[in-house]
C-alpha cells in the first residue's frame, strides 16, 4: 500500500528533523500562474472537486504567500527554503544562455541583474530527502536553468516532461518549438493531462522499498491561454479560462 502525503507547499530549511519510523511518500503539486480565486473552494465558477477535497481533508494555509509573483523566483524559494533574493533571483529566467551567471531583462529600465539558473551549490529539499533514503521524481516544468542545471542535477533521480522552456508554445502538439519532451504525443492530447498522467503512472508503477518524493510541477495555467477542447465546450461563458482549470 502506498501512503501519500499530498502538499501544495513544502519548505525545508537548513535543518531537517528525523521522520517517523514509517516514512510517508510525498507528492508536491505546483501550478503555474494559478490565482487564489481560480479554484472551486474559493470561487464556485470553477469545478475542481479533487482539489476541494484536498483542502477539506488537509490544512489550508490562507496566509502562505509566494516569495515573488513570478516563475523562477518562486521555484527557487520553494526548493531551497530561502527568500528568492538570497538565491539571486529578481525575476524569472529570461534567456537560455547558461554561460551567463546573471542576466538582465530587456524591458527593465533599471537593468537589475538576476540569475540565469539555480546554482548547484544551493541545497534543495530533494537533496535533503535523499539523506533519508527517498527516491525523488520530477514531473513537468522546471524553469531554473537548462540541461546542466536540470532536476537530475539538483537531487532528483529521474524526470519526465521537463525541458528548458518557461512556458509552452501550445497546449496541443507541437507543445514547444524546440526540445519538445513529448514528440510522440497524439495530436489531440492536452499538455496538462500528459503531466498528470505521467505522475499517476509513476505512482502506479513504483515498486521500490524506499519512500518517494514526487514533484508534479504543471506548465499550466501559464499562457498561452488555450483551454482543453472538451471542457471549453462545457464552459461556454468563459471557455478558455475555465477550460484550462
Region roles according to the model:
Residues 1-23:
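Bacterial Sec-dependent N-terminal signal peptides
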